């Protein structure tokens, strides 16, 4: 991807999650919603290193990873808006997006993503496929036992697993510094014979390069990689979270200093890769496209209640 | 006892019970994600860390297997830990410590070892689909060795939690996510919460509405749902007797059987899954008590053995709520 394409990808991610926000006050999304707003550089940065057949297994904060994995935007937005035309026919919802075609899945249970990613990694290794599995976790999820179990297995059996840690420094209200024995998550790599690196996850170019390195390591049969990308969660943990564990000043400064889109824009302008007008036009176009998509999705019907018991088992209701 | 209704949320009654028990017994402590600094995602431990310090009210990492097992060790070492599992749906990651350690050690030790521990967790539907909207009290009840509590009213939340903390047996205490922020004065039942410390014995159901036509046995949020529709149903000519079970283990089937011997009809409403759970168990016990001819009609209204779907249209089709409860009552009453 070119630098400009990375920038455009971040805009798409941001505008996608902003579209989701619109469904909360209206009740169109009637459960929890966790957005990735502020963390766009990671989703956009991983995109270019994923190849057809790769698997991505994400978390409760999964939208950006799904889009990076190639999950089509319209059925995904429709699923989040609980529509019959959604990716999972309205059964899954925002925390449970599944796309068999793109080997994308996720879990609302913290820590539950890595074991599934490990399964994909084993299958790729068994079949001699040159694919990799990305297991996503937050910093909080890295303290779940599954993190250790999966990395140990992947290390012992040299499986093509990339553990992508989105370190936004908070698990809801609990700071990672209070609950991790190591200063970084990446440094735990040595315990598993894994590649490990912590990078600035607010700079899409840095993420793209680092993810490419991690992916190369995993694809070359040398075992797992831990890529830890630092970032900032701009909104509350979920929509409705009072976010009282951070001061207004902290939150304002975070948005001013650490917005990956602003950071990329500044770099593109400084390096003469684009002009103000071009970038503004790009943002407007992206916003307009998303508004059109949202309008289309909103017009779709909800699933019919009569089908509530369908899809439990293959070929039948019960 | 003071008599004015204090307009507390359920979370506040829960925090009040824990605070009073922590004052009473220095061995009582709380551990879990976000329970300290912010006082719980629903505020059910608010102010406790300030009052009792961060050793006794501990924010943990997302390491449920470790801190649930820690609860077992702490209890064996003489403390009375309250371990918060934020949502009951997350119990899968630490079920090992719950059912193989906490619940079995008292029996396996021939009664030599006590595990006076409480797992405090939030269950019930909150619109967040398959992995965040379950009840699961039937799961715990199926596994021997734990008392299982699922309160409905503000009064019961406080008194049953105090009893759970004082219990020398392990207890799973399941709040309902949709009730935690609801205010006392909006409850039809048990809105008055005395300021002082009190405990309600575990295993005693409560008749929250007397009636003559049909016994509706339920617990947790469904008690309010049933009360909400009971007056409409009365106007239609169906006089409900509503029994709040309060605890699944012990299950007070005597109170239910006594009610059924009067009304002749039993409807069990359960927000948990239908099969192999509370509703089947309760019906069986009532039949065992009254004999197969002891009731005229029986029915169950519960989640029909599917995961909770995301879309509201589907969720309403599978999760019992006021409208579906009223419908189930009408259908049962119509059979003669
Ligand atoms: C096993 C389990 N425990 C607790 C939760 C509740 N919970 C959901 S997200 C979250 C915090 C996750 O923090 P982190 O992994 O850092 O990801 P972030 O939300 O910051 O993206 C918690 C505690 C859960 N979903 N699953």
Annotate each language-model stretch with its function.
Chain B
Residues 1-174, 178-179, 184, 316-317, ...:
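Thiamine diphosphate
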